[in-house]
Amino acid sequence: ELKGKKLGIHAYGNVGRNVARIAKGFGMEIFAFDAFCPKEVIEKDGVKAVDSADELYSACDVVSLHIPTTAETKNSINYALVNKLPKGGVLVNTARKEVINEAELIQLMEERGDLKYMTDIMPAAHETFAAKFVGRYFSTPKKMGAQTAEANINAGIAAAQQIVGFLKDGCEKFRVNKK
């Protein structure tokens, strides 16, 4: 049952915003933390902005990760942070596997039989997770976010529109290598 559950969105970019939109349809209470997104932007969407990752994990039944892998975020989802989840907490990783400190998450899940972990990219320690946490761990074999025919078509259309926007108007909104 998702209705009435508290969902935490860790990073409120495009994917995080869409997760919030969908979760609202299930009647979830939505919280978000993003170190780079202004609170006003988050709250404009009817989402409760919090001041820290610690606050997000403490407040929410489910946390959905959308952070990129950077030097600062690598292994940042660790024992201390995930242990803040309330009893029965669920961590959903649709970000990158490198943000998870797998050894610490395994240790925590051994200590807390109430935690669940779901990820759409197979962790390096998949066999350990699968053997030790039956019914509390789920993984897909590879990053599945854009592996449908529709997603690939939409990605092609979006790329074409962005190229036209750049050539026609000089729009650099989606430029990757900003100077």
Model-derived segments and their meaning:
Residues 8, 31, 116-118:
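A structural signal for isolated positions on well-ordered beta-strands in alpha/beta enzyme cores
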Residues 116, 121-179:
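C-terminal helix-to-coil terminal segments
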